[in-house]
Each structure stands twice: as C-alpha cells, then as structure tokens.
Amino acid sequence: MSRWLMQMLMLPLLLLPLGQAAPKDGVARLDPEAQQQLTTNPFQPGPEQLRRLRDYLKGLEKMEEDPEQMNREQVLLYLFALHDFDQNGQLDGLELLSMLTAALAPGAAHFPINPVILVVDMVLETQDLDGDGLMTPAELINFPGEAPKRAESLPPALQEPQPAGSQPLLANSPLQSETQQSLGTKEEITSQVEAKRALEPEQEAGHHIETKVDALSPEGEARGQAESEGDAPGPREDAERQVESKDNEGEAKDLPAETLETQNTPNVVEAHSIQLENDEI
C-alpha cells in the first residue's frame, strides 16, 4: 500500500519536466502551412510563391501600389529595396533572413533557432551563382533554368555595384548587344567611305585615260573639228562686225572736230570781251 502511494506521489514530479518541454501553440510550433512554405524556395517562379509574397506586401501599410497589379519582377525588386538596410545593392545573409522570416513565417522569429535559416541556405545554394554569400537583384530575379531578364528593367538604385575597371555582370543584356550592333554598323560605314576615297584617284586616272583615247580616236577628231567649226564665226557674222567697225571709225572722226570747237570757244568769248572794253574807253 505504501509502495503504491509513493508511486502516485512521484508521478507528477516525473511529468512536470515533460510538460514544460512540450511546445506551446503559437510560440514554438509552426502551423502546417508555414512548415510547408519552409520546404520550397519562395523565389522560384510560380503562382503559389508569388501569392505568398504578394500577401506579405498587402500587410504593409506603406504600400502605394496594389501588389495584385505587380508582376514577379516588381514584387522581388520591392522586397529587395525594402530589406537592403545598408543600401549597397546586395543582400547579405541577415538581410535575406529578415526578408524571408517576415514574408514566410513571422512567428519563427521567436524560435531559439530560426527554421527559416534552412530556407536562406537553400536560396544561397541555388541562386548565389558567384558564391560570395550575397544576393544581387539579378541573382534574385533570374532563377536558374529560366530565361535571363532584361538589364534595363532594374532601377538605377538597384544596379549591381561594380568595382572600378571591371566589366558589368549583365554584359550580355539586349541593351549592350544593340550598342555593339550600332558600333559594328558605324565601323562598316567608315570602312566603306575609306574604300571609296581610295578608289577616287583610280577613277580620276581612268577618266583622263578615257578622255585621251577618245581624243585620239577618229570619232574624237571629228567631234573636235565640229566643235571648232561651231566656234568659228560665219559670213553673216563677219559682215555685221565690219559694219560695226566702220560706224565706230566714223564716230571717232567726228570726235576730234567737236573737241576742237569746244577748245576754241573760250578764245572767242575772251576776244569779244576785250572788244567791248575798248569800245567803252
């Protein structure tokens, strides 16, 4: 009897530690939906992943645009800018952990060990292509196996930081390919102009040779004679020129007489004035 009583008294003492160690609802236990979300990459293209991220943005009070009207790239870029606390254009592990915890499992922040760390490791292993432990906007948007997005779709503030003298990571963007094509077209036009200039002296020399050959040929001689005959004055033109020359000679003969009369006029006037003075005296 006493032995059975002792066992009954010891039983609560044994169950007390187990009750304290059991997880409590809402504090140390995730709901099944959150546990399922932690098993997949939230940045993987798909309607379900996009719905989760949009739901998170809907809960933010400072959203100016309706998340339902935003596509996948816009949602990811907004999340990137929202959690890039040091504004260096890259997300480190802590910033990525803060983003995924707030978007996928807000209650996991109170866990002694955040289970979202496994998702961060999954994202870095899948999308951190250069292995530097940092996520850039291009790495966040361009999921492996998908077609790369256009580089100009990224806002200037989210462009990847590049060290001095290095090539941009998005060097194969359509914008740069168009620039290279325009440069190639310009080089082709320049080469064509230079080739044309190089051929101009040869064309001029060929033109002079053709002119000389044409002049030496019988047809060229006949053409030259016809042109010289066309330049020579005809009989009618000779007669007109002779008449004009005679008229000019007549005018030239009349001019000296008129000139003499003009020169003698002052002498006559002077003699007449002297005669008047003598009469008065």
Curated annotation (Swiss-Prot):
GO MF term (any one): calcium ion binding
**GO terms under cellular component:** extracellular region
Up-regulation conditions: By p53.
Q: Which UniProt keywords apply?
A: Calcium, Cell adhesion, Cell cycle, Growth arrest, Metal-binding, Phosphoprotein, Repeat, Secreted, Signal
The UniProt regions of compositional bias labelled Basic and acidic residues, in chain numbering, are 185-213, 234-256
Q: Which GO terms describe its biological process?
A: cell adhesion; negative regulation of cell growth; regulation of cell cycle
Sites binding Ca(2+) 1 sit at D84, D86, N88, Q90, E95
Work out whether the entry's keyword set contains Phosphoprotein: yes
Question: Entry's InterPro entries?
Answer: EF-hand-dom_pair, EF_Hand_1_Ca_BS, EF_hand_dom, ER-Golgi_Adhesion_Reg
Tissue expression per record = Expressed predominantly in whole brain and kidney, with limited expression in heart, lung, liver, and skeletal muscle and no expression in spleen and testis. Also expressed in pituitary gland, adrenal gland, digestive tract, and reproductive organs.
Q: Where in the cell is it found?
A: Secreted
Q: Which residues constitute the signal peptide according to the record? A: 1-21
Residues modified as Phosphoserine:
S217, S228
Domains: entry comment: Both EF-hands are required for function.
Q: What is this protein called?
A: Cell growth regulator with EF hand domain protein 1
